Amino acid sequence: MTEKGEPVEYGELNILYQDEYFVAIDKPAGLLVHRSFLDKHETQFAMQMLRDQLGQHVFPVHRLDRPTSGVLLFALSSESARDMNKLFIEGTITKRYLALVRGFAPESFFLDKPLKEELDKIADKFATQNKAPQAAQTQFNCLHQATLPIPIG
């Protein structure tokens, strides 16, 4: 949504790579990967947009949060999606993010904080209540720090 509450029109997705098994797109910030009960008013989703653009079903291999832009990988068959998902679960494949942040950070630090699923009372009414936390480990490395001579606040 724009600042005026109007829906954003994303147009065609930028395809970064495509072969017979996978397609990678440049997901813009603000675009959901797929439909969600948590955002019922949204009408545009990367999965449906790419399906319409390619004229075939696509299967998300991973997700990026709505405010996150970056490379989003889709499989072109359920078998390819399953095989790639297995590699993510085994830790054979990892994701790497670059972020521009405000404030000061140490040169390097490691965060080991398992993700506990917080179920939504409506959307997850029938979901498993006692699901084990998902492993989540992140190594942070500061590539550069700068001070801008611009007052903020």
What feature does the model see in each segment?
Residues 1-153:
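RNA pseudouridine synthases
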